Amino acid sequence: MISMDEIKERVILVAVDTDGSDQAERSLDELGELAKTAGAEVVGRMIQPRESIHPGTYIGKGKILELKELLWETHGTGIICDDELTSVQMGNLEAELDCKIMDRTLLILDIFAARAVSGEGKIQVELAQLKYRASRLAGLGKSLSRLGGGIGTRGPGEKKLEMDRRLIRERISRLKKELKDVERHRELIRGQRKQSGLKVAALVGYTSAGKSSIENALTQAGVLEDAMLFSTLDTTTRALTLDNTQEILLTDTVGFINKLPHHLVEAFKSTLEEAKYADIIVHVVDASNPQMDAQMHVVYETLRQLGAEGKPVITLFNKQDKVENPVNHKDLQADYSIATSAKTGQGLEEFKHALFEIIRKEQIYIERLYYFSEAGKIQLIRSKGQLLSEEYVPEGIEVKAYVPQDIYGRL
């Protein structure tokens, strides 16, 4: 839970329904969870059916009076709109409603600011926040000065972010340079992993699907597990042994969410791209969530945007311990679909076997006699492949092994 120095904010959630479906209702449910994660109390909600979002006030002038009355009745201190507002919309709403105005993007950025732990995470969050604010100073400054802080004012390390345009530009420039250094370091680490010959499997999924729980259950990594949204911002990588000799690297990544702010996608590009550079995608799904299908769609769309397509996919229908009437789900976009529970251990051995099978399909089996003078080749097999057996005979060493295709020609 994020600690709040200020009195808990009482907010009303506002959305525009442009298609007549239940999407706006479902999106507001999620917005409510985000608000709760940020430390706010939701005291009301409003959905305005419109053909399109109003360019001046988001919901249209006719709905402003009704929203004013709802704020008065609920003693609300602010509103959170379910879409990203322009500076014009934010300024007009603030002038009309005389309360704190926030949007989904500001809320998510605020949660990220409170969750950032590593130096890289803090740089990425602050950069995203400043880019968002740089184009909204006119509409944002007065609104966020209300109540002395609260949602929208937090920065990484609990610092207050400056609102001066020149200072923001200078700070963005410095952060970009720092992030470039971080990205170079990340590329170096990826290169070292590639040299090791170990395959990398990236855990991806909607926020709170249980990625960290899966990693902990398999590797005892000690990664933070939290029911709150976005409990993990920093990637963690741990080695996982699939059998006596075959290892793989398992990487946990930041969770995806509907309407993920483009400022965050840009700032967290190096972190999100762990999925792009992985050898295997492990899609963790919360099978107990009624919006499972919609969440899976968001994940695959985000992977497409990141260019992380065309890889083997294992989908884990997780949290089976919370499913009242288990269903044998099948993900048609995945190579394997497995029902799992990080809590009970259900399906984890099957998952490890699926990883093993994918790696094995990309390896070549060899039975070969090496002269004693070729011991270096056996060492290469041992470091890059899976050495099943080696037997010393008068002529040399008889080897049985599985080796990656990229080193086969050197053996």
Model feature map: region roles:
Residues T18-D22, I53-T57, R115-G119, K159-K160, ...:
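Flexible beta-alpha connector loops of hexameric P-loop NTPases
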Residues L106-A128:
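Short alpha-helix plus adjacent loop in nuclease-associated cores
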Residues R186, R193-K199, L218-E247, I257, ...:
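Switch I (effector-binding) loop of TRAFAC-class P-loop GTPase G-domains
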